Amino acid sequence: PHLALEKLAALIQELDQVVLVGSSLGGFYATQLVAKLAVPAVLINPAMQPWHLFRDLFGATQLPYRVNEHWTLDDAQLDYLEQIELPFVQDADKILVLLQQGDEVLDYREAQRYYNGAALVISETQGNHAMEDFADKIPMALQFLSDCLK
């Protein structure tokens, strides 16, 4: 996670008019990058406290967990995610959060509590972690991001 965020931050700083779209863990990362670099983002069912999620998912007996030949998830990485957690959302006016209450992986209420009152949050009943009908939301997401860049 540290290297991924470091590389993304460096790339963002080299480019003009960057916007982010992050889903699940990507939503957690995007929240960090918005706070650090003030870039706009659309978050789709963002993971809250992903270190808990991964530890619950894999358990101590399965860590380190080999994701693929190039990446292994271990306790040090999960500890890092916990250390960088932001106690409150920053630059919230640059964040659109899309939640679906039928998310079978994450508890949408955690994200709703964290972002509500700060960022623009749209919470739909039903749905799933993959964000049902996402294609229908693309025009709204693009309009939000475009407005943020003006």
Set out the residue ranges of the language-model regions:
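Active-site catalytic motif of lipid deacylating hydrolases and related acyltransferases
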Residues: 1-14, 129
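Short acidic/histidine-rich motifs immediately flanking catalytic phosphotransfer sites
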Residues: 15-19
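Gly/Ala-rich beta-loop-alpha elbow adjacent to hydrolase catalytic centers
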Residues: 21-26, 30
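Aromatic pocket-lining residues of Rossmann-like dinucleotide-binding sites
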Residues: 33-37
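The alpha/beta-hydrolase serine catalytic core
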Residues: 40-148
